[in-house]
Amino acid sequence: MPKTSYLNKNFESAHYNNVRPSYPLSLVNEIMKFHKGTRKSLVDIGCGTGKATFVVEPYFKEVIGIDPSSAMLSIAEKETNERRLDKKIRFINAPGEDLSSIRPESVDMVISAEAIHWCNLERLFQQVSSILRSDGTFAFWFYIQPEFVDFPEALNVYYKYGWSKDYMGKYLNDNQREILLNYGGEKLRSLLSDRFGDIEVTIYSPSDPNASTVTAENSQFLWRAAITLNQFKEFVKSWSIYTSWARDNPSKPDIADIFINELKEICHCEDLNVPLKIEWSTFYYLCRKRE
């Protein structure tokens, strides 16, 4: 997998868990409606602190979360114990492409939330196919970026600091950029179709209706919220690319502060605690193992 500060044992996983959004039940319901198989076993690839794991686990009897970050898993395990789910959920500290500890054709569903861009896709899809039962479902999804509803020009600032190679975007490789900016991209779709069928792709982009396959009214993965610029700054600081930038530029001003100051001007918002309306660009894939 590509280098990421998430693998650092000192990564602020508790901060990550506190500021990252959860996933809507409407999305989970859509996934379960698509699923035709039994509901015994679930595997969550790149489970991190368990954001998706705990949303989907009620539908299954056995759950395995896999993540290469021991710091992330420590948070997931703590919450598992607090929820008294330690007999139902277990975690494996391994890359998403390494599913060798799971018995072939033993899993009903594999999910991955905001994670497969860290994986070798060809290897990942081969491994997922090998552990799924013949009627098994593979579902993965991403939220891409929050778009400021009343200030569409703020998206340019987001692209500048979050995606461009001049700033934090330089810590994303070309494959990751393709997945995140092109709703999966052609390479992903080609590799996926080699091993999976009945592929459904659902895209919602507030700023690009031509790319969207659904409207806001019928999207099952719709995130609308009010967020302050201070809250948004904490979200930025949860990014691995932010941590990497801060590590490599210790003598420079905090890139998150610079980012927020530009947004403050664009959004005409002197008070960083004033809520601003946002809407997320999202996409998700649903598919089944080929017979």
UniProtKB/Swiss-Prot annotation:
Q: Which GO terms describe its cellular component?
A: cytoplasm
Gene3D superfamilies to which the protein is assigned, alphabetical: Vaccinia Virus protein VP39 (3.40.50.150)
Its primary localisation, in coarse terms, equals cytoplasm
> Which Enzyme Commission numbers does its entry carry?
2.1.1.-
Can you cite a GO biological process for this protein? methylation
In the induction comment, the record states: By cell wall perturbation.
Q: Which GO terms describe its molecular function?
A: methyltransferase activity; mRNA binding; S-adenosylmethionine-dependent methyltransferase activity
What InterPro entries does UniProt report for this protein, alphabetically?
Answer: Diverse_substrate_MTase (IPR051052), Methyltransf_11 (IPR013216), SAM-dependent_MTases_sf (IPR029063)
The record ties this protein, via SUPFAM superfamilies, to: S-adenosyl-L-methionine-dependent methyltransferases
The family classification in the record reads: Belongs to the methyltransferase superfamily.
Q: Extra notes? A: Present with 4380 molecules/cell in log phase SD medium.
Role this protein plays: Probable S-adenosylmethionine-dependent methyltransferase which mediates cantharidin resistance.
Q: What is this protein called?
A: Probable S-adenosylmethionine-dependent methyltransferase CRG1
